[in-house]
């Protein structure tokens, strides 16, 4: 399954969110506290205490945006968005190659997401590297854009060499646990919606939407 990159937050919302996070100087802590035993060995960043007021309020903002975005809903089929946290990495910090835990206290991880909160030119290094079968995909998106990718992927964050990287990360438990099945459903839904927009409703299109809905019902968990 190919990752989805998509604008999620507008400029004003990102600016306000960034200012709020950085103003809370007392709630940032060692990121290894939230890592699994294997990932903790390669994790070197700061994360906002999930129990802080700042984290709780702004996590809900991000979750609501993800839950209400039509493309995200079609791509991820989210049942539960969980584990949302805010992370910052300064010079010399990063996160070595690892895979996310399959199950967390907050839910199953089918898809992982990273929402970028500052512009790529404001820091050097810090790219999200997602390992594929043949190579590695490096990602640094504009502020407000999100990447959603399978949690089964090995991935890392390059060491920051200048400036500071600020992101929001989290996980999605999907109604469809299989990446392959989710890809098929996404393509079927996208094609049906495009036909609806171009030609309007028809008995034939009703059959396609019926097939999509019943496949979702059959494959879903």
UniProtKB/Swiss-Prot annotation:
Its EC number is 1.14.11.-. Fe cation binds at residues 98, 100, 155. Signal peptide: none annotated. It comes from the Bacteria. Its cofactor is Fe(2+); L-ascorbate. Residues 80-174 form the Fe2OG dioxygenase domain. 2-oxoglutarate binds at residue 165. Pfam families: 2OG-FeII_Oxy_3 (PF13640). PANTHER family: PKHD-TYPE HYDROXYLASE YBIX. This is PKHD-type hydroxylase PMT_0286.
